[in-house]
Amino acid sequence: MERAVPERWRLEDLWALDLPRVRFALAELTWLLDLPLWQRDGVRFQVSPNEVLRNPAGHPQHARRIAEADLTRPIHVIRRDGRWTVLDGHHRLAAAVRRQHTAVDAWLVSAADLAEITR
């Protein structure tokens, strides 16, 4: 199973970083929507954002999080293996796609930033 970011870190540490904020094109991140990023029945990496977007009734918890996502709060992105990936904000990413946005606000995380908070 492909994982976008294999390192382990805490969200609180990520949120505490002082990062540049930019407007970020969703087209750079849509590859993530097919990955099983979310849990189902307590088992991690079972449900993709696209599955929820196609069948919200089948995934009510994730559908609710997408519907309630606050797009004024930036997502966290990092460049890995030649492409951009999301560290925090997958439900916000799905919400932006659902709402037909073309860009979102994002905090840019560098490899050095991630190394600083990796356990």
Task: Please report, for each region that a protein language model flagged, where it lies by residue.
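Short hydrophobic/aromatic-enriched beta-strand-loop microsegments
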Residues: 103-109
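N-terminal leader/domain-start detector
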Residues: 1-28
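Short loop/turn hinge sites at secondary-structure boundaries
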Residues: 69, 100-101
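Short alpha-helix boundary/capping and kink motifs at helix termini
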Residues: 32-85
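Residue-level "edge-of-site" marker
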Residues: 79, 109-110
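Amphipathic, charge-rich alpha-helical segments that serve as recognition/docking helices
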Residues: 51, 55, 111-119
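A sequence-level detector for short glycine-anchored, His/Arg-bearing signature motifs
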Residues: 83-99
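Glycine-centered loop/turn positions within well-structured domains
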Residues: 73, 93, 102
